[in-house]
Amino acid sequence: MHLLAPLALTTKPSPLTYTSKSSNALYQRRVAGKRSALKTSKLCVRAIDAAQPFDSEARQSIRAREAITLKIGIVGFGNFGQFLSKRFVADGHTVIATSRTDYCSTAVELGVQFFKDGDDFCEEHPDVVIFCTSILSLESTLEEFPFQRLRRDTLVCDVLSVKQFPKHLFVQRLPKHFDILCLHPMFGPDSGKGSWQDLPLVFDKVRIGEGDKRQERCNHLLRFFETQGCRMVEMSCEEHDRQAASSQFITHTVGRMLGTMELSETTISTKGFDSLLSLVDNTYHDSFDLYYGLFLYNENASTELARLELAFDQVKSQLFCRLHELIRTEHFGKDLET
């Protein structure tokens, strides 16, 4: 728009000011110059295309944020459930929990929404449900849990220290439209109280339904542990139990034996002895139900316990055989020579 055009057309030189032809010509030239400047000037308008809620870009952005944030339900809000929840919340995930014991105050401190009633818990429709119960109570918990109130595509996980047992229960008891992921973080509140760097996380994708959404959800949950520094190990539940019997069960057994001895630090403790005390700290404070579950629900544990007992007897036998030889030599040395 030429804002000065009307003004220029209606403005006439004052007879008092422009009395001569030369003055009038000068005035006309000035007006013409202003008109020319207006014709050549351009109005530049710059604007940022801000995403609106109804834009496709905005919807894609919202979906992207939702894709990396999970609503995770914890069933069994004891020490291990609280241990995992704290990390999930710190990573930006929404965590809800339910348990037979009332942990409302603890949940508030951790930023977790706690539900006393399992039905109310399921009505929140978590993306992932993780059973953090004890090994011994898993079966009874599954019998009482209202799975029918969950969404049909819910991902169900466990973090038990044995894997074949929960796998079989899930396959037998859960509706077929549920996804199943068996997990075992090979650490706990004591051994994992600091960094999770290089700590093993064993997983078995027992049943993950078709569709990008289901695959991405499962992978994103696993990616959480990976970004925390865990060493990711994909392994069948059967192979896990075979290896765990000769590693985890033996570790807990030796730790409990040493804990029963009430070992304590001395002024001349060696690094080896400090390692034994660390083993006691990482195992002896776990509940006996956990240790008993490792024995009862791993079919390989009895064999490893027998091997441990046999190895101890062999070492003790070597000691006493050498001692008996020494005693015989001292008391019957001359007779033995003849």
Regions found by a protein language model. Name each.
Residues 41-116, 120:
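NAD(P)+-binding Rossmann beta1-loop-alpha1 motif at the extreme N-terminus of oxidoreductases
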Residues 1-49:
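N-terminal chloroplast transit peptides
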Residues 5, 116-155:
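Rossmann-like NAD(P)-binding element
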